[in-house]
Amino acid sequence: MSDTIAAIATAPGQGGIAIVRVSGDMAEDILRRIFRPVGGKHPLPTHLLTYGYIVEDTERIDECMAVIMRAPKSYTRENVVEFQLHGGGCVAQKVLAMCLSSGARLAQPGEFTRRAFLNGRIDLSQAEAVMDLIAAQGEQSRKAAMRQLTGGASSFIRKAADELYAIQAGVAACIDYPEEISEEEAASDLAPRIAHLAKTLTDACDERAARLLQSGLRVALCGQPNVGKSSLLNALLGEEKAIVTAIPGTTRDLVEGTLMLSGSVIHLTDTAGLHDTDDPVERIGVDRARRALADADVVLLVLDMSRPLSAEDESLLRTLHGRNGCIVLNKSDLPPVLTDSDLQDAADGKPILTVSASVPDSLQPLKSYLASQAAVSDQLTLTQPRHIAAARRAVAALHQAEETLRSYSVDLAGVDLQQAQMALAEITGDEVEEKLLDEVFGRFCVGK
């Protein structure tokens, strides 16, 4: 990391401000070469914005603000310089080119954050939280990413690792001093502690909640043609996303939209009406609808309450059995023919909500239901699929160690415990291969 890196840190396109970031030993030299402070001189004070101009030879390139953050009090723990320029690609590209011609090289994706990790300012789980914070679409995801960035996952894993070290010390004592600690005594003392640690880690592994934070809740609207699925989708989204006509089978392909409820991201998919058809195009739409239902976290079965329950509706109700979802009685603004009492037996305990796509206030119970399905605990510890996978490997090794220990093979149990320790260290990056670092930081943008 002896070289100096530079990159544009803001998104491409026009905007109020564009930022060029430089990190490394030559950062301050580059600042001196291309920035002329107004009413001041170099060296600039650390961590304070200074007004001036980017200058090439005698030409003023841009009017800007510049700041130097001297090591170790910077994002990378190296000398870091940032130029706050007028937004727009041309200016930022020009200033970046000047930085590169002055001795810096173009940063790789995620290299600034990678240097923060390698220099010990953050661990690997916190580095991943930076990406999660950037990618967060909802308040719920933002809060989870911030908890991880401020060390929530790290402190939990390190506490678990400390307990594991203590258990390993007990195993080592039994091996080194067999005349003082028998294998039976070691098993009696350590096996319950291993089991408790395995349970603690298992409780922290909630794959569904982690996926909701990463990707949002997937909701599929299904039902027969002309029950108002597309109208309901449009009403929930507050826009005319799907084409609505009185002609059955208007929706032939999947229509998707994203809704934000109580800080959660909810992806809605309107599907083609589920029915038998000889139309080859419509049949493709029905097949896609069935695949969307299979992939959904929540299924909304939409029924038209202005007409009686049909055999096809009853068939759809049966397909909802064993699935997470609810029954939506639509068109409540029309004279009712079908009521929730008619569906109690067929509902299989699913919630039954009465709405009208044309009456916005009637949608609130449905929105509340969707928000509850998308909610995750504020106490969720592990939110990254990679972390959960590593914790699962640690749990498997702990269970193996417990079983081995109870058969009085203390030395073999020590091997299993070491495997568990390595899995936990992979989460924080204490033990990690270069290939994994490339994979993690390769997901970042260049300027981060």
How should these model regions be labeled?
Residues E282-S306:
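Inter-motif core of Ras-like GTPase G domains
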Residues S2-I8, P12, G52, E139-M260, ...:
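C-terminal-of-GTPase-core extension/linker across diverse P-loop GTPases
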Residues L268, V302, V328:
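Generic enzyme active-site microenvironment
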Residues S23-G24, G88, P248, M305-S306, ...:
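Short beta->alpha junction loops/turns
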Residues M1-K143, R147, G151, D162, ...:
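A glycine-rich (often HGG/GG-containing) alpha/beta subdomain
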Residues T50-D62, A66-R70, G249-T277, D295-V298:
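Switch I (G2) and immediately adjacent beta-strands of P-loop GTPase domains
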Residues L237, A272-G273, D297, D304-M305, ...:
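Short glycine-/small-residue-rich Rossmann-like dinucleotide-binding loops
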Residues R105, V265-H267, P351:
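Conserved beta-strand segments of alpha/beta enzyme cores
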